[in-house]
Amino acid sequence: MALVRKRRQINLRLPVPPLSVHLPWFSFASSTAPVINNGISASDVEKLHVLGRGSSGIVYKVHHKTTGEIYALKSVNGDMSPAFTRQLAREMEILRRTDSPYVVRCQGIFEKPIVGEVSILMEYMDGGNLESLRGAVTEKQLAGFSRQILKGLSYLHSLKIVHRDIKPANLLLNSRNEVKIADFGVSKIITRSLDYCNSYVGTCAYMSPERFDSAAGENSDVYAGDIWSFGVMILELFVGHFPLLPQGQRPDWATLMCVVCFGEPPRAPEGCSDEFRSFVDCCLRKESSERWTASQLLGHPFLRESL
């Protein structure tokens, strides 16, 4: 008797970006995320140089004038669209809630309503992000990184926070080989058991099948998308290139949608240990209900490599 695989039907309509409508300055101090200062004021820190620039602001390396402690300062301009205003308020609320050695720590949030600026003071990670390590890590190193990232995800998920943008650029490293989760700009706090959060946000290259397929996503595990992204990222670090497409091929939305929704999940290459191949498989199962959770993955035999 022939087995017939159920054909996946997905919504192929792409979202239309909202119009860029700018709002007057919004005071985040009056929102659900109170201003954090930890005893540090904006005048206590001095900018040293730029670490990075984005469409919404600039990240500086700064130091405390009295203690000499080094921090990263993310400065965001107040001339923002409604969507970005909500995004920033959500990020600040998550930073207020989190306190974990596996999540980049927020040291202060400063407002300048007159000039329309918000600055977020964070711990400084002197090793950059994991992008620079693609193709240059061993299984043992990956196991050590994975253990820390999964502890961070397990912590966030226990607080009902879905990150929605796990990728090498958002995982920061320091000189002690500690890896921490950063950038909560598109994250979401799940406030009800039926909250639906599999929308077109984050980096599409790391989106799970249910996030491309909005109809299927409504009934999926809201946290499982983070595990898919984690699995793609771990495999990318090992093989040295984005694993869902041939090396050198630039991912685009339509190609990724077809590969992720209709193709077979990527596998670890030949020559890897059975434990690593199994670990990747547990992360990259097409059905979200079959993917292991962060807590389950922490008990996987592959992570014994990091002990």
Swiss-Prot record:
InterPro entries: Kinase-like_dom_sf, Prot_kinase_dom, Protein_kinase_ATP_BS, Ser-Thr/Tyr_kinase_cat_dom, Ser/Thr_kinase_AS. Induction: By Pseudomonas syringae pv. tomato (Pst) DC3000/avrRpt2 infection. The modification Phosphoserine is found at S193, S199. Keywords: ATP-binding, Kinase, Nucleotide-binding, Phosphoprotein, Plant defense, Serine/threonine-protein kinase, Transferase. Expressed in all tissues, with a relatively higher level in leaves and lower level in roots and flowers. The keyword Kinase applies. It comes from the Eukaryota. It holds the Pfam family Pkinase. One of its GO terms (biological process) is defense response to bacterium. SMART domains: S_TKc. ATP binds at L51, G52, R53, G54, S55, S56, G57, I58, V59, K74. Gene3D superfamilies: Phosphorylase Kinase, domain 1, Transferase(Phosphotransferase) domain 1. May function as a negative regulator of polar auxin transport. Positively regulates plant basal and systemic acquired resistance (SAR). Activates MPK3 and MPK6 in vitro. Overexpression of MKK5 (mutant bud1) causes deficiency in polar auxin transport and leads to plant architectural abnormality. The bud1 mutant accumulates elevated levels of SA, and exhibits constitutive PR gene expression and enhanced resistance to both bacterial and oomycete pathogens. Belongs to the protein kinase superfamily. STE Ser/Thr protein kinase family. MAP kinase kinase subfamily. This is Mitogen-activated protein kinase kinase 7. It comes from Arabidopsis thaliana (Mouse-ear cress).
